[in-house]
Amino acid sequence: MAWPRIFQRGALLSRFSHHHMVVFLLTFFSYSLLHASRKTFSNVKVSISKQWTPSAFNKSTELLPVEIWSSNHLFPSAEEATLFLGMLDTIFLFSYAVGLFISGIVGDRLNLRWVLSFGMCSSALVVFVFGTLTEWLHFYNKGLYCSLWIVNGLLQSTGWPCVVAVMGNWFGKAGRGVVFGLWSACASVGNILGACLASSVLQYGYEYAFLVTAAVQFAGGIIIFFGLLVSPEEIGIPGIETEDNFEEDSHRPLINGAENEDEAEPNYSIQEGNTVTQVKAISFYQACCLPGVIAYSLAYACLKLVNYSFFFWLPFYLSNNFGWKEAEADQLSIWYDVGGIIGGTLQGFISDMLQKRAPVLALSLLLAIGSLVGYSRSPNDKSINALLMAVTGFFIGGPSNMISSAISADLGRQELIQGSSEALATVTGIVDGTGSIGAAVGQYLVSLIQDNLGWMWVFYFFILMTSCTVLFISPLIVRETCSLMQRRQTRVLNE
């Protein structure tokens, strides 16, 4: 089996400069900060609910005038406040999903650095107004909260398509799986960062949790504006298209099923003066028609539903099903993220060695079905539960990270469009936007199934969605597996 050039002796030093490392870190932490603000909202829900409802020791006491003493009581009970907070989650996910489709198109037409910086800074201001300014002014309004969270979802959606596009500009397809697998841990790091920032100041009031998160995110947006290099061409380094077009036959784009014998002419042009011609962004419809985009988008809608359900519901499931303390359940749920980080990195490495993604995904998702069956029958033991949780995260979180990052980059840099059009951000927006719609619908369905049928049927639902993920990419799995076998037979005959 041929090793990708990036793993061969001396290839890493020759291909990657300190600029690559800076881009890796800046994009990693920019998305981590966006995820941190989402996690902050989850961590302060209890405090917000208490602020929006009457205090227990005041229920039997009528304080006059009522307009002053009860102005912050949006809801008569904590249950109604919790329901509204859950509705805000759904509103955010739907607006985020819609925004992903728009942000991808905008990112391919404007400077990615501008779009990402604008999204981070503007989102930070919205978070500040939502959680801090309204509390300082004691202004509480359900319509305002909903409007702000819709805007926040749209602004946060600028993050993922832009950072994936920038990473795709800097890192070629050789080694992209392992690089993106490691890089996609940014969301998990952001969750941890958000929890730490919120818990450090929550004792002073939930508004300060929003203030600290918003301030750090705004500062990150400023750093991105002045420090991020969108592509190697900005500093005179040859683009990855130039390098990738001279790869040998075995290093063709990983989402292509067939390996044509006829070598196509490099699909890029050079102007006089050795400057790359200005490329044109493709339309939304053209991006959808690219091979593999619709298949992976539908597959990701099913898989992200399962992955985000674990993200939102895992601590509640552990507390509700096993009777463990909320703090213990929160700490234990980290093992799912750990499994996802390891899974995304290792599976990306294997797919780089095979130069194919779909067969690796297929095997992982089939094993994910078994891990879901095993985890649904986990005993009331924290150690065993953590182990099964990590295994489940490995086989579900790993493929989810790979589709949203490495595969999206592959899809946006196919030979069909390479060097003649920009599609990376648009394709990433389509894939992640479709996935987010599935995740938004899934949160409601999980709640409905759990209330009426119980947790075991929730796991049956997860198994069904994981099976649908395999079904949607089955043509790609068959095509790439056959191509892999043909290549192996050719190598054996040549030997």
UniProtKB/Swiss-Prot annotation:
Under the heading CDD domains, the entry gives: MFS_SLC37A3
Tell me one GO biological process term: xenobiotic transmembrane transport
Q: How is it modified after translation?
A: Glycosylated.
Functional note: Unlike the other SLC37 members, lacks glucose-6-phosphate antiporter activity. In osteoclasts, forms a transporter complex with ATRAID for nitrogen-containing-bisphophonates (N-BPs) required for releasing N-BP molecules that have trafficked to lysosomes through fluid-phase endocytosis into the cytosol.
| Gene, per the UniProt record | SLC37A3
Q: What name does UniProt use for this protein?
A: Sugar phosphate exchanger 3
GO-annotated molecular function: xenobiotic transmembrane transporter activity
Per the similarity annotation, which family is this?
Belongs to the major facilitator superfamily. Organophosphate:Pi antiporter (OPA) (TC 2.A.1.4) family.
